């Protein structure tokens, strides 16, 4: 800081509320333990300020001496406030200052006959589909300024998009094939997407939305499911659109006989719309989120794109061929078996477990989190193999994968009643290998003894013997296929 303003820096650390401890961002943003300690130190004025505040003016100031740039930054509101979505509100405030004007505005009707039309402000429910979605897309989409001129404007007076408009002309949305501006690594953006172009990191919800057939139909938008003024703040889903109702408000015929469409029991997770059509395949900050690309599962497409498949994420003991054959039998001959995985791993082993051991960091994070989900497609007592494989994730080179593995292991242990909770809770995912490795060996020994005493034999082919010892001769070749590249989350 100085006379020309101040530079605010984000430290490469965060306070993790769930664990009640400081966590290095390498262990959050999908990087290995030995990566650059200061990589995630960032200038708040040129990065964080845009999506976490309202009325942003970074105020970039030239130094004239070629030194570090200076900022004189201002925001109208710290955090996301009314004008982020409703636009500049001076005219609205002045209009509603008069009781008579408020009464008249409340009675005014729009073209659809709805009251409250004369608001002098942007209402997401009263603008077109593209304009409504753009209100969310201004932040919930990774993007670049549309031109170099726009870039310098953004860094001085702020983004040029205003609610009520569209994003085109203001920003360019990132896609898998978007060129990376120098000096960035050429594959930076490509690593943020699955091989078929589906986003696999958070903050791409708008991109997924616009790729969805529902959106291309012209009616579907963010407000079809979400509301900012009601419901649970965690997901901001409209109370009357929870569960399947978000989908059946349009797909009413399916709702009349869910099992006929899903071929699963109506009360099971296999009959929940989002489990198949918006699977949890997106990595966020130590959480796995639902894809916002609404589409149908396709085993061949997903496997060949290196993308977790909704069917085998739930049926974790099944291989890709089984899933493809079931889809062809139940939903049509156009479904085929996969040709090959991008990593060259075998197709004749359980697809989810192969991704856990051979996949890249995002695949491993998504898969190990899925193993611990309560709605997995098998009885609780049959999930000992899932816990065994999740324990392997505790030895991962990426802290984020280890944390998710411990979370899943705790859930699986609670379902199986093996009594490992104390040891799992004490396992420090941030400790060095000299501490973690012996602790993991002790955990595996305790697990094996408890599982042999209390559980039925595991399914064949799940990398666990009948004695609940890991089949390391099968797992080690898969571990050798792992790709350890940096996944630039872009936050």
Predicted regions: what they are:
Residues 1-6, 10-12, 17-20, 24-32, ...:
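Primarily the internal scaffold of c-type cytochrome electron-transfer domains
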Residues 27-30, 40-47, 54:
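A gly/proline- and charged-residue-enriched helix-loop-helix capping module
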Residues 347-353, 385-392:
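Alpha-helical solenoid scaffolds in eukaryotic proteins
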Residues 367, 405-406:
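Conserved hydrophobic register position within alpha-solenoid helical repeats
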Residues 374-377, 412-416:
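Residue-level signature of the C-terminal ends
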Residues 395-401:
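Short coil/turn segments at helix-helix junctions and helix-capping linkers
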Residues 413-424, 453:
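Alpha-helical linker/edge segments of TPR/alpha-solenoid repeat scaffolds
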Residues 453-491:
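Eukaryotic intrinsically disordered, low-complexity regulatory tails and linkers enriched
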């Amino acid at each position: 800081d100085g006379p020309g303003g101040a530079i605010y820096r984000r430290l490469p650390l965060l306070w993790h509320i769930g664990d009640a401890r400081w966590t290095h961002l390498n262990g959050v943003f999908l990087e290995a333990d030995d990566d650059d300690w200061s990589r995630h130190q960032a200038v708040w004025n040129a990065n964080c300020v845009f999506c976490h505040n309202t009325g942003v003016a970074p105020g970039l100031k030239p130094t004239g001496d070629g030194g570090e740039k200076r900022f004189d930054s201002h925001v109208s509101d710290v955090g996301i406030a009314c004008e982020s979505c409703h636009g500049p509100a001076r005219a609205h405030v002045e209009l509603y200052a008069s009781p008579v004007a408020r009464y008249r505005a409340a009675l005014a009707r729009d073209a659809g006959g709805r009251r409250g039309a004369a608001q002098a402000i942007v209402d997401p429910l009263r603008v077109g589909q593209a304009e409504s979605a753009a209100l969310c897309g201004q932040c919930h989409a990774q993007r670049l300024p549309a031109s170099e001129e726009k870039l310098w404007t953004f860094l001085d007076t702020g983004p040029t998009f205003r609610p009520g408009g569209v994003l085109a002309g203001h920003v360019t949305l990132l896609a898998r094939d978007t060129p990376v501006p120098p000096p960035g690594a050429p594959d930076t953006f490509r690593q943020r997407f699955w091989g078929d172009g589906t986003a696999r990191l958070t903050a791409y919800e708008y991109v997924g939305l616009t790729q969805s057939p529902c959106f291309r139909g012209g009616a579907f938008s963010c407000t079809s499911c979400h509301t900012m003024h009601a419901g649970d703040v965690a997901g901001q889903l409209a109370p009357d659109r929870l569960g399947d109702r978000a989908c059946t408000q349009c797909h009413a015929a399916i709702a009349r006989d869910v099992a006929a469409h899903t071929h699963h029991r109506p009360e099971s997770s296999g009959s929940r719309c989002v489990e198949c059509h918006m699977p949890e395949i997106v990595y966020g900050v130590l959480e796995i989120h639902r894809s916002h690309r609404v589409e149908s599962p396709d085993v061949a497409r997903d496997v060949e794109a290196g993308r977790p498949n909704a069917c085998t994420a739930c049926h974790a003991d099944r291989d890709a061929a089984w899933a493809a054959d079931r889809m062809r039998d139940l939903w049509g001959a156009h479904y085929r078996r996969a040709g090959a995985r991008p990593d060259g791993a075998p197709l004749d082993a359980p697809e989810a477990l192969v991704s856990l051991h051979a996949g890249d960091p995002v695949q491993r994070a998504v898969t190990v989190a899925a193993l611990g989900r309560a709605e997995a497609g098998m009885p609780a007592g049959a999930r000992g193999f899932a816990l065994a494989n999740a324990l392997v994730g505790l030895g991962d080179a990426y802290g984020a994968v280890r944390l998710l593995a411990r979370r899943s292991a705790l859930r699986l242990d609670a379902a199986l009643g093996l009594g490992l909770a104390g040891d799992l809770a004490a396992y420090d995912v941030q400790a060095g290998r000299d501490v973690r490795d012996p602790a993991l060996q002790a955990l595996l020994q305790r697990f094996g003894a408890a599982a042999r005493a209390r559980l039925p034999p595991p399914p064949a082919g799940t990398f666990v013997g009948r004695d609940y010892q890991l089949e390391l001769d099968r797992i080690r070749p898969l571990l050798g296929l792992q790709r350890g590249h940096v996944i630039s989350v872009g936050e």
